[in-house]
Amino acid sequence: MINYVAHWDRILIQSRSKIVNELNNYEFRSICPIVDDAELKKYYSESLNWKISREKYFDFSAVFRLRKILKSTDNGSVFHIFTLKTGFLFMISNLFLDKKFKSTLSVTGLGYFFSKNTSAKIFKILLRPIFLALVNKTFQNIIYQNTSDEISFNKYSKFKNNSHLIESSGINTPDYFLKDEFNENIKIILAGRLLKDKGIDDYLKLSKNFNKQNVTFFLAGDLDIGNPNSLTQEELEAIKAESSLNYLGYIDLQKELHNYDLLFSLSDHEGFSRVLLEAMYV
């Protein structure tokens, strides 16, 4: 049994479910907060509900819940952990357990933790001793999506085990509707979680200052409650009221991306933006 661990079930449903489908000689268990139980059941042999608040950047009560799950897991089990945030919680949960796991961490982007935000810089300094003490004991492998993240995190954490570069999580191309022709009135879109380090403010300024009549700007995505870089509800309401920009909420990019002509990606500290790969294909 291979255990996939993430702090959000959508992480294990989107691209990772395709990997599970391809590796049909193995059984997979999802360990995450279960929101979309029906989707998880399509792909995973078993799903364990790891309760964690997404409204907190670090939900330390979730450490005890994950620790309980790890205690009930067989010695020598295989774990694949997704995102740096989940990796940190896994390290703490695994501390002093009388078990040895085969664990791999996928860093899909360094995100808020490596941003220029003052609070993030303080967090980074305070948590470094924990990474220095535990990262090599916990993870046999770390997978990165770009060399910049690989160099930065390995230097920060002094990670000495196996470091791998896999550029992008990939997409399943038959799932996407392809674009036949461009619109007469050009549609520009930025799609992703509504985080400040996704370049939302710059995109909004661009839409306000752009004066061509045949261009329309769209923004798609949800708030990421609990992420310190997330827009607030008040900021989102201001965007909704903005005449230069059309807010769409969450959309299914596999079915909807072909309706747009140009995609912007303005992210900082992104591993390899999945939406860029989707746009290049569509």
Report the location of each language-model feature.
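Acidic anion/phosphate-binding donor-loop and adjacent secondary structure
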Residues: 57-58, 154, 164-186, 196, ...
